[in-house]
Swiss-Prot record:
Keywords: Hydrolase, Pyridoxal phosphate. It comes from the Bacteria. This is 1-aminocyclopropane-1-carboxylate deaminase. It comes from Bradyrhizobium sp. (strain BTAi1 / ATCC BAA-1182). Its EC number is 3.5.99.7. Belongs to the ACC deaminase/D-cysteine desulfhydrase family. CDD domains: ACCD. Its cofactor is pyridoxal 5'-phosphate. HAMAP family: ACC_deaminase. The active site is at S79. One of its GO terms (molecular function) is D-cysteine desulfhydrase activity.
Length: 339
């Protein structure tokens, strides 16, 4: 049994998220593989929720115990993560500084004024747009923001991009795996594959550790959306090892149990391809399930392509992890102006 119980958890979500069968999407893809979705996009009342809240539930107790008064984080201009950090800060009564780097080579008249960044500002966060480009690692702009809070007499608590390389960043998605196992028992089924978008890495890494407990680590199929897959793979490996030790998995996860597919991130991080847009429209028009062009649209594209290519054996049950992110689609208003 994985030892998640050792760690304090601050409630930011409604609890277990629903799993739903997607019959019209299943039929549209030929009906030979059954598609389900785990709706982590519907996990909270905090500013439209999303996957980062699972991670932050295990990080907030540490932030509170540190006597911090300001959460400091980083992401792109349309970062879901910085929205969730801003929401968490508002909920627990802390100040918030978020650095918004220029990660996406995307031009839209309203890109920096709608969606995630709009809500981030609305919740009172100090949102600082900087020109630095995309990188999932530890960033100088973030370190500078932490120092600026100190210089102003504040007590910062740093949360890296995606909450991923934080010491507790992988715990929330170990919990996801435990939750899925309980739901499988209730539903009387077992999922053969789990599809998840991967960029900064801790969502997939936590799932890998969680599903390693029942031998399904290599059934967690990461769809890279970073466009820098080797950096992502290295970061996932590090988070897997750290998280496995924290929860006492009792063995090292093998390299061949970390599955990341690199075929769908093109043309660049945050820039949807024609195939991404087709996937977004198909999910919307068959199941009214909204996915975004940065993350979930690309993992949806990957899943659709894998089904069509016969990657999954006939009769497989595939669980699509919907991590949230729909607010970002507002920053692509011209792309989707006609649907």
């Amino acid at each position: 049994m994985l030892r998640l119980d050792k760690f304090k958890k601050y409630p930011l979500t409604f609890g277990a998220t629903p799993i739903e069968h997607l019959p019209r999407l299943t039929a549209a893809l030929g009906g030979k593989v059954q598609i389900y979705a785990k709706r982590d996009d519907c996990n909270s009342g905090l500013a439209m929720g999303g996957n980062k809240l699972r991670k932050l539930e295990y990080i907030v107790p540490d932030a509170i115990e540190s006597n911090a008064d300001t959460l400091v984080s980083i992401g792109g201009v349309q970062s879901n993560h910085t929205r969730m950090v801003a929401a968490t800060a508002a909920k627990i009564g802390m100040k918030c500084v978020v650095v918004q780097e220029s990660w996406v080579p995307h031009e839209d008249a309203v890109y920096d004024r709608v969606g995630n960044i709009l809500m981030t500002r609305l919740m009172g966060a100090d949102s600082r747009i900087v020109p630095d480009g995309f990188d999932i690692g530890i960033r100088k702009s973030w370190e500078d923001a932490i120092q600026s809070v100190k210089d102003a007499g504040g007590k910062p608590y740093g949360i890296p991009a995606g909450a991923s390389v934080h010491k507790f960043g992988g715990l929330g998605y170990v919990g996801f795996a435990e939750e899925v196992r309980a739901q499988e028992a209730e539903m009387g089924i077992k999922f053969d594959y789990i599809i998840v978008c991967v960029v900064t890495g801790s969502t997939q890494a936590g799932m890998i550790v969680g599903f390693a407990a029942d031998g399904r680590a290599d059934r967690v199929i990461g769809i890279d959306a970073s466009g820098t897959p080797e950096q992502t793979r290295t970061q996932v490996r590090q988070i897997v090892d750290n998280t496995a030790e924290l929860v006492e998995l009792g063995r090292k996860v093998r390299d061949d149990e970390i599955v990341i597919l690199e075929d769908y991130a093109y043309p660049a991080y945050g820039v949807p391809s024609a195939e991404t847009n087709e996937a977004i429209r198909l999910a919307a028009r068959t199941e009214a399930m909204i996915t975004d062009p940065v993350y979930e649209g690309k993992s949806m594209q990957g899943m659709i392509d894998l089904v069509k290519k016969g990657y999954f054996p006939e009769g497989s049950k595939v669980l699509y992890a919907h991590l949230g992110g729909a607010p970002a689609i507002n920053g692509y208003s011209y792309t989707y102006r006609n649907g």
